[in-house]
Amino acid sequence: MARVCQVTGKGPMVGNNVSHANNKTKRRFMPNLQYRRFWVESENRWVRLRITSAGLRLIDKKGIDAILVDLRARGEI
């Protein structure tokens, strides 16, 4: 699915634009998606992921190997 983080699963949300006169129109809040390459030492190769900034922080915290195990278990990669 497009515009979805491969690590966290975050996608677009729906909300309203609210003007000064309190008029409301529908809008979408898009996730902050970035394409990033990660060097996987155990596999001796680069892995390219489409992730949000929150997913990037999660990779910094857990490590790329732990994230890849989760992705493979879900069938993402």
From Swiss-Prot:
One GO cellular component term noted in the UniProt record for this chain: cytosolic large ribosomal subunit
Gene3D superfamilies per the UniProt record, alphabetical: Ribosomal protein L28/L24
One example GO MF annotation: structural constituent of ribosome
Alphabetical GO biological process terms: translation
Alphabetic keyword roster: Ribonucleoprotein, Ribosomal protein
Key word Ribosomal protein present: yes
Domain of life: Bacteria
Similarity comment: family membership: Belongs to the bacterial ribosomal protein bL28 family.
PANTHER family per UniProt: 39S RIBOSOMAL PROTEIN L28, MITOCHONDRIAL, LARGE RIBOSOMAL SUBUNIT PROTEIN BL28M
Protein name: Large ribosomal subunit protein bL28
Organism the protein comes from: Polaromonas sp. (strain JS666 / ATCC BAA-500)
